[in-house]
UniProtKB/Swiss-Prot annotation:
Keywords: ATP-binding, Ligase, Nucleotide-binding, Protein biosynthesis. The keyword Phosphoprotein does not apply. Belongs to the GatB/GatE family. GatB subfamily. One of its GO terms (molecular function) is glutaminyl-tRNA synthase (glutamine-hydrolyzing) activity. It comes from the Archaea. The gene is gatB. GO terms for biological process: glutaminyl-tRNAGln biosynthesis via transamidation; translation. Heterotrimer of A, B and C subunits. This is Aspartyl/glutamyl-tRNA(Asn/Gln) amidotransferase subunit B. It is an enzyme of class 6 (ligase). Allows the formation of correctly charged Asn-tRNA(Asn) or Gln-tRNA(Gln) through the transamidation of misacylated Asp-tRNA(Asn) or Glu-tRNA(Gln) in organisms which lack either or both of asparaginyl-tRNA or glutaminyl-tRNA synthetases. The reaction takes place in the presence of glutamine and ATP through an activated phospho-Asp-tRNA(Asn) or phospho-Glu-tRNA(Gln).
Length: 495
């Protein structure tokens, strides 16, 4: 199938990612673990840009950038260097940002996503290293702020800025790209996406192959999709009314779901880049072979292996490999000898589904227990033991519990109200599968009490059978096997 793009939509992204798994900042020894710290307590003369200070490059930043480039199948530069990006803004104490200009460390990469018409390649123009500026805290909304506070704890944090080609053709594709890109970074162990401000996105979008508009500094994948949906609609309306799209920078108001004009778009020359005289150019060709040896199994390779090794579906493999810690958790469960297909169903469909419903984000996996935090309140923590999943899968495979019972146990554990094993929860809640004679009795009672539904089914109304099965499940408090109940009902009705 050829994907139609009648509106000529082109979307490119600029993604700023903090290398927050590194211990220290880009050019000084200040800790990167500042998120719960008081303002301006993780600073020093270097990251505050005080006169007379000199930067000392953190080698691990360069190594992490090379890792990212290799994972993106990009070309790693033989020689790379830093530049000064000159502009005045309160969050930039030096009056310039140390970044890379015409010698980026990575160029010409790619990421394969699920597009609107199957697999779709998004080109990577470049990826380069730079330092993060400080953080402005607006008193009130950004458009009506009565004042601004500055926190320099973030100043000097190591960043990778990745620029894509304008290869995405819908907001949904842009979100899928961001999901895949984040997944790759988490597999590389250079990035923790659960931290506030860890990934910020500038989205460039045009319609009818026309003038592009940049929507600046969007902080979530969902926000990027919403901002693009609005901006595409806005541009179409301007053109429909005979107007002209102006090349400009806009801000996305998350609360209102609209983009607002900030300024006309600067050209690169406005920043007057020049080489950073305090940092020497680097030849990094010799670093690459050793770093390549440290690359982990990446998401696409792991997905393919899961399908081949465990015999699971592509859908389950995609879900399980969408988070490195979830993939490790699943493999830990399978290592205990349980049925990998049943384990995939319960982990990918039920467990992950319950996490998403509760707005919980996976935050850790220590080999035995997977931890998670509430996406909107990181102070809310809980965990789920691999041994509990092994026990559940085993009980289900042995026919001792129904699927409803297994779901109830998972929900009870995630609610965090009881420190008990699955067997203890099942025993206390009476969730062990009902004996055959109990199910047979429940089927007979259901048929006798629901004559209208029986007649409807015999008359050709298939959904009435589902109603009857539901009544049996209700009588047995969910302990009957739904498939068995269905078979017994059909046996009775068809004589």
């Amino acid at each position: 199938m050829v994907y139609e793009n009648p509106d000529g939509i082109r979307i490119g992204l600029e993604i700023h990612v903090q290398l927050n798994k590194l211990k220290t900042k880009m050019f000084c020894g200040c800790s990167t673990d500042y998120h719960n710290a008081a303002p301006n307590t993780h600073t020093c003369p270097i990251c505050l840009g005080l006169p007379g200070t000199l930067p000392v490059l953190n080698k691990k930043v360069v190594e992490a950038a090379i890792k990212v480039g290799l994972a993106l199948e990009g070309e790693i530069a033989e020689e790379t260097q830093f530049h000064r990006k000159n502009y005045f803004y309160p969050d930039l104490p030096k009056g310039f940002q140390v970044t890379q200009y015409d010698y980026p460390i990575v160029s010409k990469g790619k990421v394969v996503i699920e597009g609107e018409d199957g697999e779709h390649v998004v080109g990577i123009t470049r990826a380069h290293m730079e330092e993060d500026p400080g953080k402005l805290v607006h008193i009130g909304s950004i458009g009506k702020s009565k004042g601004v506070l500055i926190d320099y704890n973030r100043s000097g944090m190591p960043l990778i800025e990745t620029v894509t080609e304008p290869d995405m053709r819908s907001p949904k594709e842009a979100r899928r790209f961001l999901d895949k890109f984040r997944n790759i970074l988490e597999y590389l162990d250079v990035f923790d996406g659960n931290l506030e401000g860890a990934m910020r996105v500038d989205a460039n979008v045009s319609v009818h192959w026309g003038t592009r508009v940049e929507v600046k500094n969007i902080s979530s994948h969902k926000g990027v999709e919403r901002a693009l949906l609005y901006e595409i609609m806005r541009q179409k309306n301007v053109i429909r009314r005979g107007g002209t799209i102006v090349q400009e920078t806009r801000h996305f108001d998350e609360g209102r779901g609209v983009t607002l004009s900030m300024r006309t778009k600067e050209e690169a020359e406005d920043y007057r880049y020049f080489r950073e005289p305090d940092l020497m150019p680097m030849r990094i060709t010799d670093w690459i072979p050793a770093i390549k040896e440290t690359l982990p199994e990446l998401p696409d390779a792991k997905r393919t292996r899961f399908i081949e090794q465990y015999g699971i579906t592509d859908m389950h493999a995609r879900a399980l490999t969408s988070k490195i810690m979830l993939a490790d958790f699943y493999e830990g469960v399978c290592a205990k000898g349980v049925d990998p297909k049943i384990a995939a169903t319960w982990t990918a469909d039920v467990f992950l589904g319950e996490l998403n419903y509760r707005d919980l984000a996976i935050s850790s996996y220590g080999g035995k227990t997977i931890g998670f935090i509430h996406a909107k309140d990181p102070e809310v923590e809980n965990s789920f033991k691999g041994s509990d999943m092994v026990e559940l899968v085993t009980l289900f495979a042995e026919g001792k519990i129904s699927d409803r019972a297994a779901v109830e146990v998972i929900r009870t554990i995630l609610d965090g109200t009881e420190e008990k094993t699955p067997s203890q929860i099942i025993e206390e809640k009476g969730l062990f599968k009902a004996e055959d004679d109990l199910v047979t009795k429940a089927v007979a009672e259901t048929i006798a009490e629901n004559a209208a539904a029986v007649q409807d089914y015999l008359g050709g109304t298939e959904k009435s059978l589902n109603f009857l099965v539901g009544q049996v499940m209700k009588k047995t408090k969910g302990t009957a096997d739904a498939k068995t109940a269905r078979e017994l009902i059909l046996k009775e009705l068809k004589g």
